[in-house]
Swiss-Prot record:
This is Alpha-conotoxin PeIVA. GO terms for cellular component: extracellular region; host cell postsynaptic membrane. One of its GO terms (molecular function) is ion channel regulator activity. It comes from the Eukaryota. Contains 3 disulfide bonds. They are not added, since framework IV presents two different connectivities (I-V, II-III, IV-VI and I-III, II-V, IV-VI).
Length: 18
């Protein structure tokens, strides 16, 4: 998911700030 444009994935998953 990280760095890959995916509508199903939220950026907060990569940053750890959800």
């Amino acid at each position: 998911c990280c760095g890959v444009p995916n509508a199903a994935c939220h950026p907060c998953v990569c940053t750890g700030k959800c």
